Amino acid sequence: MLATVLTDKRPIIKVSINGHETAALVDTGASLSIVSESDMSKLKFKRGSKLAGTVIGLDGSEQSMYHTDKDFDFKVEGLPAYQFVIGNIDAIKSSIKKETGIEISAIIGYPTIKQLELIINPSTNEISIGYKD
């Protein structure tokens, strides 16, 4: 199965968060999968408990992250994806929108890439999904 890739400039795919269609960056270098804290009300999700410790962002700043609540629902081509945390990704969102015109709501990091068995083929601009529910 193929994910719907939205641009040839970055590996950005169509996803569903709590039934709302949006976009996510597939980032093989990200150790966490993060959903945008600033999109909580738009996508109708709440944050759960705070993660222990802090995470260092791309700019070197420390930030707190939160678990998603029990009702959080993230899907790629109808398949459920897990292991997301909530964090501030506004700087990344802004950079990507400036470059591609697409506003992302999440970053799919390595744990979720493994779970969905995503394979990125930059030659064909395709992202295949090996996981079957």
Model-found features: residue ranges?
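Pepsin/retropepsin-fold aspartyl endopeptidases
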Residues: M1-D133
